[in-house]
């Protein structure tokens, strides 16, 4: 199997010969790109342009780098996963619920932060959004004030929406080293994004414009998984499609958490 660098070199040559929009067939196994060809080879192929394939490999390289993010710590010590919900997206809703279950499977202790009453109708209102963040962040500081972060061998932050801003800001301000899963981040999230983070965004998310999220993720080298036509909950309204989305999303989450 070729390395990512070898695949990118092949793609650059093919793009010069046939153009960036030439269709090829990407071969994947367990969600990992293994190569590409000009004829479909079932069942592990998807049709894709050379340009999109190039972007897919870049994202996979970032994902592998984020998954393998490590820091000096006692790996035999307990592991802690902290859940940072959104304003209306609580810890028992699908993305956070299943991500928490995966973390528990890998022997993480689970701690869910909860917020008190926050301003309503904050969408599109910068002042209310700022107030909601400040209130939720203050409550987060209080909820986590007694934790000895140095006593844990591995730390994982799992967050959603405004919770991605809170989690990233908290980790940055307290210099907490660990991995972070960002479900439907906001643009403000990337002001604090740190190494070892991955993000998930729906292209129909009314809370965050896709081009802005894509640009910010690239600037911070945060691997970004885009779900076409999905909203702020990574849902489309089609039950079967939504079940497929949660399955694909959790496969990425599982690999990310499982990587030492």
Where are the model-predicted features located?
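Serine-hydrolase catalytic machinery in alpha/beta-hydrolase-like enzymes
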Residues: 63-151
């Amino acid at each position: 199997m070729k390395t990512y660098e070898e695949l990118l070199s092949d793609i650059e040559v093919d793009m010069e010969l046939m153009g960036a929009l030439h269709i090829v067939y990407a071969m994947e196994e367990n969600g990992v790109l293994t190569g590409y060809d000009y004829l479909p080879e079932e069942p592990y192929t998807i049709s894709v342009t050379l340009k999109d394939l190039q972007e897919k490999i870049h994202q996979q390289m970032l994902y592998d780098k984020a998954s393998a993010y490590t820091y000096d710590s006692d790996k035999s010590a307990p592991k802690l996963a902290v859940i940072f919900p959104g304003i209306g997206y609580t810890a028992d809703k699908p993305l956070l619920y299943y991500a928490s279950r995966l973390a528990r499977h890998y022997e993480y202790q689970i701690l869910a932060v909860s917020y008190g009453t926050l301003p309503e109708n904050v969408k599109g209102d910068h002042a209310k959004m700022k107030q909601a963040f400040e209130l939720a962040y203050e409550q987060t500081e209080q909820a986590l004030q007694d934790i000895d972060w140095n006593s844990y061998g591995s730390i994982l932050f799992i967050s959603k929406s405004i919770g991605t801003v809170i989690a990233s800001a908290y980790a940055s301000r307290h210099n907490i080293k660990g991995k972070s899963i960002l479900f439907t981040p906001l643009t403000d999230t990337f002001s604090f994004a740190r190494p070892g983070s991955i993000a998930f965004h729906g292209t129909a998310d009314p809370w965050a414009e896709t081009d802005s999220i894509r640009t910010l993720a690239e600037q911070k080298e945060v691997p970004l998984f885009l779900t076409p036509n999905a909203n702020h909950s990574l849902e489309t309204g089609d039950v079967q499609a939504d079940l497929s989305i949660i399955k694909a999303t959790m496969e990425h989450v599982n690999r990310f958490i499982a990587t030492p």
